[in-house]
């Protein structure tokens, strides 16, 4: 911050946006190749490139904020605006799935048998695994709030324990969702019901895995005393993201599982 007369962080040139874009392209191309040829080599290479980019990029951001002091109050304020806009974009992303779901379910076409769920589809019981998943995810929302409150009081040990419990619940949710996918009596190719079910819940599951990774990084940083009562935006952003995932699941449970049954 020497000789800097403003509060903004002027970042140094970085290769990570380029490698991240390349990794995303390889990942998307690898998915297409996997679907058509059952070859996962390009998919694995793209995923590895993306993971390495994420690790290096996050490392640089942590160094700039924690050790170099570049994240001033003004920078943190702009980061909050950025996170709010990002979550807003995610809201509209999922809104498209809900729009499609209600578009086809409120007025089913003759091709679907003029009923919802379509003829031949046996929906999952919303009172079984989906209800357990709801309880698990809502519990994780409570534990992450507990972690945040105790951290704000300076009790980092209890905050770490609550955060680890949240991570365990997130991993448990993912495992339950995977077991549910393996037992569903329909596939993604079974009419618009199957495609909407797997795409909507699948993207939500992907967000849960991303959020769990986000929280794992925060747990590591919390253990290394990177966060203080006044300087912990990375942790706060992870909490916002996790609560967003909770809320989306509630709408999915009501719309896909309960309404869809």
Swiss-Prot record:
Residues 1-15, 67-72, 153-155, 224-232 are mitochondrial matrix. One of its GO terms (biological process) is mitochondrial electron transport, cytochrome c to oxygen. This is Cytochrome c oxidase subunit 3. Pfam families: COX3 (PF00510). Its main location: mitochondrion. Residues 35-40, 106-128, 184-190, 257-261 are mitochondrial intermembrane. It is a multi-pass membrane protein. The keyword S-adenosyl-L-methionine does not apply. Belongs to the cytochrome c oxidase subunit 3 family. It catalyses: 4 Fe(II)-[cytochrome c] + O2 + 8 H(+)(in) = 4 Fe(III)-[cytochrome c] + 2 H2O + 4 H(+)(out). The keyword Transmembrane applies. SUPFAM superfamilies: Cytochrome c oxidase subunit III-like. It is an enzyme of class 7 (translocase). It comes from Lycodon semicarinatus. PANTHER family: CYTOCHROME C OXIDASE SUBUNIT 3 (PTHR11403:SF7), CYTOCHROME C OXIDASE SUBUNIT III (PTHR11403). Signal peptide: none annotated. One of its GO terms (molecular function) is cytochrome-c oxidase activity. Its EC number is 7.1.1.9.
